[in-house]
């Protein structure tokens, strides 16, 4: 579905067009703020390798963790890449695009609040900036480096912590975004962390999305 035609999202799913549009808009906002700034995007965020992609061993095994009742997430922690970030609810704009966290708060992670709560049955979606208008790393700059099995912890408003394990990390061209694969679920509590990534051009912004797939493994 074309971004301009998407106006709403069901509670348990997120429009891929919306997320991709949000990334394009974020990159465009950087250009509006900075004009032509050759130094900002000389490098690019880390890209996941083929070893981090899905394989037979990447699918969940072992006991199933009982889903939690809904509760808002308040903090995201990924010790492996030094992330310890507050979370805020984000929604869709009038065009159906997922609103990223405020541009002035690159250390803030956003949770799609009209979707699944992290730890509940279904696929929860969190997003964050990969970088800032001045080229500094954002909260999700290093998502592309996460290895399988890496722990992701989300502290919730009910004082429980949903603990997830990374199953795979993949980079998708935004023109070939596999929405069913990304937003679909296995029936277990799952998590997706999504940010902009891939190549970057001053005309179109980032050309892809880095997606982290994770499954609930424990509750503390």
Task: Report the location of each language-model feature.
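N-terminal export and membrane-targeting signals
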Residues: 3-25
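Short, intrinsically disordered, low-complexity terminal/loop segments
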Residues: 1-4, 219-220
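Solvent-exposed, non-transmembrane regions of membrane-associated and secreted proteins
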Residues: 26-147, 155-160, 168-220
């Amino acid at each position: 579905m074309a971004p301009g035609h998407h106006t709403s999202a069901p509670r348990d799913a997120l429009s891929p067009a919306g997320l991709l549009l949000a990334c394009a808009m974020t990159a465009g906002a950087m250009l509006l703020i900075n004009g032509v700034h050759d130094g900002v995007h000389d490098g690019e965020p880390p890209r996941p390798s083929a070893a981090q992609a899905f394989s037979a061993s990447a699918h969940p095994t072992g006991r199933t963790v009982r889903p939690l009742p809904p509760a808002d997430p308040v903090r995201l922690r990924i010790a492996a890449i030094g992330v310890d970030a507050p979370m805020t609810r984000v929604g869709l704009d009038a065009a159906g695009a997922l609103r990223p966290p405020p541009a002035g708060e690159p250390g803030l992670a956003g949770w799609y609040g009209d979707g699944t709560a992290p730890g509940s049955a279904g696929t929860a979606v969190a997003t964050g900036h990969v970088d800032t208008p001045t080229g500094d790393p954002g909260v999700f700059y290093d998502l592309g480096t996460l290895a399988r099995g890496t722990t992701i912890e989300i502290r919730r408003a009910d004082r429980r912590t949903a603990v997830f394990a990374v199953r795979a990390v993949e980079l998708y061209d935004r023109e070939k975004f596999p929405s069913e694969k990304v937003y679909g679920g296995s029936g277990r509590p799952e998590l997706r962390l999504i940010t902009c990534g891939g190549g970057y051009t001053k005309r179109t912004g980032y050309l892809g999305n880095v997606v982290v797939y994770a499954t609930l493994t424990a509750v503390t």
